[in-house]
Amino acid sequence: MTRILLLGLDPETVDFSDPALPPGMNAEKVRAAIAVALKQFTERGWESDLCFIRPDETAGTTVERQLASTAYDCVVIGAGVRLPPRGLPLFEAVINAVRKAAPDATIAFNTRPDDSADAAARGLALRSRTV
């Protein structure tokens, strides 16, 4: 069965005042949208896991630990990890941890939590063309 990892910042650690993030978002809205994404994964017949990271030096280790526990076909990295320019070191740590711990998984990016299933579908399509 296809397995997806949705990887994002713990909503309680996000600075929603950052202009690089979509306006009007808050932790409650992010959690609700993540619930939608997880439901959409199930509706598409995919198993999924959610991994929250913190914007600190533990992020890479957290990602590697999660990826060591299960083989994933696609890792969807949330917009909160990649969008804020000041978060570039975090984004780099996450990408390198995924590449190291799950070299066979495709990497996909959402624009908001509730379009994660579409991001995973794009990633899985790439996987089917390269496997």
Name the predicted role of every residue range.
Residues M1-A20:
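N-terminal, charge-rich interaction modules
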Residues L21-K39:
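Short catalytic helix/loop segments, enriched in acidic residues and glycine
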Residues R31-I34, A93-T130:
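Ser/Thr/Gly-rich flexible loops in soluble cytosolic domains mediating phosphotransfer, phosphorylation
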Residues T42-S48:
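A generic structural motif
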Residues D49-T58, N110-P113:
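Short beta->alpha junction loops
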Residues E57-E64, A117-D118:
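Structural motif
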Residues T61-R99:
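Mid-chain, well-packed structural core segment of small domains
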